[in-house]
Structures are given as structure tokens and as C-alpha cells.
Amino acid sequence: MNTSVELRSTRAQRREARRRAHHLVTADEHSLADLEMFLATLPLCASGRIFIEVPDASDIGVIDAPGRMTVTWLARGQRSGAPGSGRSCAPGQALARATCAWADEMMCDGEIETHVTLLGGYLGTADIVDHLTTTLDIAPALIHAPERFGLLPADR
């Protein structure tokens, strides 16, 4: 009789462990193919947030993502640059702002492990890596960015 209860308990623990691992994924118009390949490797039960920056609202498309992941498209053409500057949004700026704001709110307590995959351009990715590692003290081992950017230690 205990076996049935233990089995259910073990299943519940495994289910809870899968649900607790979140993903934070970023991309831009140049990395959409990489994003689609990455999303195809995730299990259907994956959860988390995907931020995609594109030049204009007309560039927004459909991404095949797991059902528990939220996709947010960020059109630079409809956003401003630095507050009060009157400038237009530079490449990577909207992506960095949205990702850092989400991370500040959702990754502040470290209760849920979040795997970070940054596929966007260098400028936005550099700002995000800096914010995650210095402000939020996220371990570099949980962050994946293109090696060509040289933003993370090679021995992580």
C-alpha cells in the first residue's frame, strides 16, 4: 500500500521539478532561424518567456513555441530610445530593457531555476548578460550566449 503512495509522491516530485525550470529566451530579426531551432529542442512542457526584437511591427510573425511559453514581440519602430532623449530605439535596446525588467521581477528570489538563452545581437546581449550577472547575481553557467561575443567565461 505504501508503494502506491510513494509512486504518486515520486511522480509529483518529478512533475514539480520539470515545472520549476523556466526558460528566458531572447532573439532579434537576425537570429529567428536559431530561435526556431532552439525552441524545437525544448520539451512541450517547457515554460518561460521569449522576447523577440524586430525593426517594425510588420516584421512580427508566428513562432512555434511550447504552449507554456509566452512570446513577446518588440518592434523598435514603435519604441523610443533612452528616456528623455527623443531618439529612436537602437538595435538591442528594446530587447535589453524588456528582458532586464522581466528578470528583475521574475528572477529576484532564485526560487525557480531559469535557463537563459540569448540569441540576439551583441549590444542587447551584452547589456542583458551584464545585468543578470552583476545586478541579479545569476551564475554564468545558467546563461547561454553566442561564444563569438566573448561575454561569458569559457570555463563555465
Annotate each predicted stretch with a short phrase.
Residues 1-156:
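Extended, composition-driven regions rather than compact fold-specific motifs
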